[in-house]
Amino acid sequence: GNYYEHNVIPKNGIKTARMLGHITYLSEEHMDSRFGRKFQDEGSKVEESVSFEVENYLQYKGEQFSELFDANSYILMTKVMDSYDAGKDKPLVEALKEVKAEFLIVGFYSDWLYPPERGKEIQIAAMNNNIRSSFVVLQGDHGHDSFLFSSKTYSNLITNFIES
């Protein structure tokens, strides 16, 4: 809504959206190894109703995000990301017909948002257009965020691709 006019920020909504989103960015393995079923230390609770460490972490991340990010920007960005489809009006292979670039497609086994199968679809469409492409799937414990964490293999892939 138009919260600017009323000077009321929809903090709970953006906080909840970030908490839900954050779960999909991380892998199940990472969440389990970091939090498991650990109960939250009473002295470091963000909210009184929080029982588990993972709840506290997500509450903290949501609170932090709600202070830094505008709710309308988040809504717009989410809609754009959700609705983008390179093959929306035609098959992906046709959408890539005019591409002159080479492709390096990197996926992570733990990524729930863009699983490796999506990368494979892009590579097949590229190959059907005689586009030089490489497709690699890496291990990463951080789900969709795996590319953000330092990885010598990931860095070497990108460096070799750019330099070749």
Where do the model's predicted regions map?
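Alpha/beta-hydrolase-fold enzymes
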Residues: 1-64
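Helix-enriched interaction subdomains in cytosolic or periplasmic regions
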Residues: 63-72
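Short alpha-helical scaffolding segments that buttress acidic/His motifs in well-ordered protein cores
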Residues: 20-24, 74-81
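Active-site nucleophile elbow and catalytic-triad environment of alpha/beta-hydrolase enzymes
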Residues: 60-61, 76-95
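Conserved alpha/beta-hydrolase "acid-adjacent" motif
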Residues: 112-121
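Short beta-strand/loop motif that positions the catalytic acidic residue
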Residues: 99, 105-107
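Catalytic active-site module of serine/aspartate enzymes centered on a nucleophile-bearing elbow/loop
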Residues: 120-164
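Short, conserved loop/helix-junction motifs that constitute active-site signature segments
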Residues: 96-100, 127-129
